[in-house]
Regions:
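Basic, flexible Lys/Arg- and Gly-enriched helix-loop patches that mediate nucleic-acid binding at interfaces
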Residues: 1-155
Length: 155
């Protein structure tokens, strides 16, 4: 939020990232858009790169793909794409896309399968990606990006 101190209008985040998560955080001055993008009924996908210690068996990734039972209920199926196994450094890297917005959901899902998250980075929300944007940097959306977000939010 410190990055936006000079902004002439009030802006607020669409969703949140926990303290140990980095990556894309959409900021807006449009309350209706924010509310609709955050509401689970709109099923807005958020994609993360996850790094966990150890080599995750395919069966464990498959559990994430069908949904897992957390203390606050069953999760919706997630899209999971294996990026790499590093046998030498003993970690697994994968993408996971979810459309729910439960507190620390990706971390809790990984805990459930027995592979706690070491690093977590949100790389995409709906049609927006952080490609080409350095850590701690921000930019305004293009008119096309905003129109696509409004379409996703059904505005």
């Amino acid at each position: 939020m410190d990055l936006l101190k000079g902004c002439p209008t009030r802006v607020f985040p669409v969703g949140r990232l926990d303290y140990n998560t980095e990556g894309l955080l959409l900021m807006t001055n449009d309350g209706e858009l924010a509310q609709k993008l955050m509401h689970p009924s709109h099923e807005v996908n958020k994609t993360y790169v996850v790094k966990v210690p150890g080599i995750v068996p395919q069966e464990k990734l498959d559990l994430l793909r069908v949904g897992v039972k957390l203390e606050d209920g069953m999760t919706a199926p997630a899209f999971v794409n294996l990026i790499a196994y590093d046998h030498e450094k003993n970690y697994t890297l994968f993408n996971i896309s979810i459309h729910e917005g439960r507190n620390r959901q990706v971390r809790r899902m990984c805990d459930f399968i027995g592979f706690p998250v070491r690093e977590l980075k949100r790389t995409k929300m709906a049609n927006l990606t952080i490609n080409g944007l350095g850590k701690g940097r921000y930019r305004e959306l293009t008119e096309q990006e905003l129109a696509e977000l409004k379409k996703v939010a059904r505005i």
